[in-house]
């Protein structure tokens, strides 16, 4: 254990292939970083879709928090960073309806062309400021609608991946603006969704 590891902040950094928990402490005027846990993040093909293994990732995050405590860190806060566009749907009782589907899933193939038969593409880009990519949340949701996915009827709330981890860690459901801006659902000027 280090001399002074009070006021430590943890970063939970989830990437497409791996994740890690990093402890950051200001010691004698210098920022000290230590990777306390590293883990793999693999997608799971089940039926016709590719899913993130959210329960396993959440367990790995909790393992990292426990390891930080065992190393003597006094954790003051945690930041959670993941990829954008993917999400989990929460029902009215606070339960996750399904493992989140991975942006690498083929369900959004061809969706931009279908959406832009309904929306004006240029006006949409002017409103959101987000590059059109088939993986974006807008097209994931439209695919679900086109396929009459019953989760859309049951869902009470959509949480983007970092907010989903935060929700299951704290019990507080929020969507942070920066990650929500990756969805192609937000009005960039009004900073909200219509």
Each model region followed by its residue ranges:
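N-terminal glycine/serine-rich phosphate-binding loop of ATP-dependent small-molecule kinases
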Residues: 1-99, 110, 114, 126, ...
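Gly/Ser/Thr-rich active-site cleft segment
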Residues: 14-16, 124-194
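Carbohydrate-associated surface elements
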Residues: 105
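Gly/Ser-rich phosphate-binding catalytic loop and adjacent alpha/beta segment
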Residues: 108-111, 118, 132-134
